UniProtKB/Swiss-Prot annotation:
Family: Belongs to the Mediator complex subunit 27 family.
Keywords: Activator, Nucleus, Transcription, Transcription regulation
Described purpose of this protein according to its UniProt entry: Component of the Mediator complex, a coactivator involved in the regulated transcription of nearly all RNA polymerase II-dependent genes. Mediator functions as a bridge to convey information from gene-specific regulatory proteins to the basal RNA polymerase II transcription machinery. Mediator is recruited to promoters by direct interactions with regulatory proteins and serves as a scaffold for the assembly of a functional preinitiation complex with RNA polymerase II and the general transcription factors.
Protein name in UniProt: Mediator of RNA polymerase II transcription subunit 27
Subunit structure: Component of the Mediator complex.
Pfam family, one: Med27
Major site of localization recorded for this protein: nucleus
InterPro entries hit by this protein: Mediator_Med27
GO biological process, one term: positive regulation of transcription initiation by RNA polymerase II
Coiled-coil regions listed in the entry: none
UniProt KW Transcription keyword: yes
Annotated organism of origin: Schizosaccharomyces pombe (strain 972 / ATCC 24843) (Fission yeast)
Keyword check for Electron transport: no
Subcellular location: Nucleus
Length: 273
């Protein structure tokens, strides 16, 4: 076989190899393409089921919004009624141990080391905080006017010792006396439902005015400082909402230094007040 014939034969072999590779690639594509198309266009039955479920979900959401809108006058009436007279608020708290003891034992006492349980129990809230009366106390809402004005917040007073505080970031809180004579605070803002829900769920705003007011004013700085426990930033990116607490070591009227901003999971047990 001449040299020319050998070279021609080798070229034909290379072309055959290239042709075989093309056939193999074509076979792979024939297998892959239907799978890809199936992902892009699911089977008719699956698509219809998804569409039906989605439509049902949309109808339920629309029905909820319609019902909520039709009930808006009820919510408006409840809020105005609460502002007009805080006694209209029905108690939603559980009876404490003192109440249960009085109800079930008819004020019977047990002797402990020569003293009765009534002698050993803690003084009533009204005995500890006589100065918390809204109009007659040394520490009343007037004591915080400077802090409120400096923070850019707006205070609106109502009848029967209740008032509304709107922070500079538009979060709104209602202060009122509950049926036990203590101050209760409720976040009534609708600007950011996530923040409102977190504040209402993670805090028990109940007690005296001098400890509650600095806490509430501190909520205008939701994301401006790190967690006082783990020192990491309270990040709005991850929707980390702070849990504001008063420093347990503070025994005087708290200032901004006495307020702790903590991640919910970083609240030490000893700081819960």
């Amino acid at each position: 076989m001449s040299l020319e014939e050998q070279r021609t034969r080798d070229e034909l072999k290379h072309k055959l190899l290239d042709l075989n590779q093309l056939h193999e690639q074509l076979a792979e594509l024939r297998t892959i393409c239907p799978s890809l198309l199936k992902l892009l266009h699911p089977e008719t039955g699956t698509s219809r089921k998804f569409e039906k479920s989605a439509q049902e979900a949309i109808e339920k959401v629309n029905s909820f919004y319609t019902h909520l809108k039709s009930s808006q006058n009820v919510f408006d009436y409840a809020e105005k009624s609460l502002q007009a007279d805080s006694s209209n608020l029905l108690p939603t708290y559980l009876y404490n141990s003192e109440d249960l003891s009085n109800d079930t034992e008819n004020n019977e006492t047990k002797s402990i080391n020569g003293k009765s349980a009534l002698d050993l129990k803690e003084p009533h809230h009204s005995e500890l905080h006589d100065n918390d009366n809204f109009q007659n106390s040394d520490i009343n809402i007037e004591s915080f006017k400077g802090d409120i004005e400096a923070s850019g917040s707006i205070l609106t007073t109502h009848e029967n010792k209740s008032f509304t505080l709107k922070l500079a970031n538009e979060l709104e809180f209602i202060f009122f006396h509950d049926t036990r004579g203590k101050f209760s605070v409720y976040c009534s803002s609708s600007k950011d439902d996530a923040i409102t829900f977190s504040i209402n769920r993670n805090n028990n705003f109940l007690g005296n005015l001098w400890s509650l007011m600095p806490k509430i004013l501190d909520y205008q700085h939701l994301y401006s400082k790190p967690c006082d426990f783990c020192k990491s930033l309270i990040s709005p990116v991850y929707l980390e909402l702070p849990s504001v607490r008063r420093n347990a070591n503070s025994t005087v009227k708290p200032t901004s230094k006495d307020i702790l901003a903590l991640h919910a999971e970083c609240v030490p047990a000893q700081s819960d007040l």
